[in-house]
Amino acid sequence: SSTCIPSGQPCPYNENCCSQSCTFKENENGNTVKRCD
């Protein structure tokens, strides 16, 4: 029903991503955020 989250966008869970994979990544500010792979 809901559209999947594209690669590189913030995500809560793996299932939300088009790739079915949401992992912690470091951004420019050095903060760690979960984004779709």
Swiss-Prot record:
GO molecular function, one term: calcium channel inhibitor activity
PROSITE patterns, per the entry: OMEGA_ACTX_1
Assigned keywords, A-Z: Calcium channel impairing toxin, Disulfide bond, Ion channel impairing toxin, Knottin, Neurotoxin, Secreted, Toxin, Voltage-gated calcium channel impairing toxin
GO cellular component: extracellular region
Gene Ontology BP terms: defense response
Site (Critical for insecticidal activity) location in chain: 10, 27, 35
Cysteine-cysteine disulfides: 4-18, 11-22, 17-36
Locations listed in the record: Secreted
InterPro entries from the UniProt entry: Omega-atracotox (IPR009415), Omega-atracotox_CS (IPR018071)
Primary role: Inhibits insect, but not mammalian, voltage-gated calcium channels (Cav).
Family assignment from sequence similarity: Belongs to the neurotoxin 08 (Shiva) family. 01 (omega toxin) subfamily.
Protein name: Omega-hexatoxin-Hv1c
Species: Hadronyche versuta
